[in-house]
């Protein structure tokens, strides 16, 4: 391309692994947590996958605008699974030990996540979304850094160039259909901060209902969603490879 012709070949890259090893980013523990889609959610997921396959049969080819909208809609099914609320309710028992924590939520369950964490779990928190202007965001980040806020419940903001270096724990209820965006989200919470030795990433991964596992690889449903499941697996693998607790 003209850019490569002008600047020449890339002779040096500085990736996430190097940034962590050289101390520019904080090391992290990675905890993938599978949660099962409901039957209704899975039916919608299957339907969208069928439509996407017809519109975009070859993954290595450019995706059309219509197919992209369907892919995003399918990702939203995973991001907004009701099972993620159940998981939070079950696993966040004591609120006293929670601090400098971000919950990255899907849009449809966002208000329910706020209610669960703020009302039922009694966390001192605030939403952190596109609705907050830059001045408000700045005040919230300052309160978060001081510890006045235990948590921020975020939606999309980590895709908009917002770094949150005081973050020590991040719950990813929502992933992204774009790999680059998800890598950026991880990088934004790994920024160094005084006293921050490591970070924890808890990744809630939506998978097909439990009965799907018992159907085996020969089932029609497995064939339909195989590529999507593989993408989730590759994301988990990538995140795990750079984690302290690599497995």
Please give the residue ranges for each predicted region.
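Post-DEXD/H (motif II) to motif III coupling segment of the RecA-like Helicase ATP-binding lobe
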Residues: 1-30
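Conserved strand-helix element at the start of the C-terminal RecA-like helicase core
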Residues: 31-42, 46-115
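Long, largely alpha-helical accessory region at the distal end of helicase-like NTP-driven motors
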Residues: 75, 213-247
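Conserved helicase ATPase core of P-loop NTP-dependent helicases/translocases
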Residues: 100-104, 109-118, 122-159
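Conserved segment of the helicase C-terminal RecA-like domain
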Residues: 188-224
């Amino acid at each position: 391309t003209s850019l490569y012709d002008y600047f020449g070949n890339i002779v040096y890259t500085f990736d996430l692994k190097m940034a962590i090893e050289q101390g520019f980013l904080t090391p992290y523990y990675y905890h993938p947590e599978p949660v099962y889609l409901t039957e209704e959610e899975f039916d919608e997921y299957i339907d969208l996958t069928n439509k996407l396959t017809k519109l975009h049969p070859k993954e290595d080819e450019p995706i059309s605008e219509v197919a992209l909208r369907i892919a995003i809609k399918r990702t939203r099914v995973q991001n907004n699974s009701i099972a993620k609320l159940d998981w939070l309710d079950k696993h966040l028992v004591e609120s006293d030990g929670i601090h400098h924590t971000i919950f990255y939520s899907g849009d449809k369950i966002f208000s329910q996540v706020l209610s669960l964490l703020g009302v039922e779990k009694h966390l001192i928190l605030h939403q952190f979304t596109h609705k907050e202007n830059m001045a408000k965001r700045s005040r919230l980040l300052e309160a978060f850094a001081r510890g006045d806020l235990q948590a921020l419940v975020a939606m999309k903001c980590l895709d908009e160039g917002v770094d949150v270096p005081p973050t020590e724990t991040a719950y990813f209820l929502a992933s992204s259909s774009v790999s680059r965006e998800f890598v950026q989200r991880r990088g934004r919470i790994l920024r160094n901060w005084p006293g921050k030795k490591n970070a924890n990433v808890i990744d809630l991964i939506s998978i097909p209902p439990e009965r799907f596992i018992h159907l085996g690889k020969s089932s029609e449903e497995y064939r339909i969603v195989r590529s999507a499941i593989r993408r989730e697996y590759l994301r988990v693998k990538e995140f795990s490879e750079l984690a302290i607790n690599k497995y």
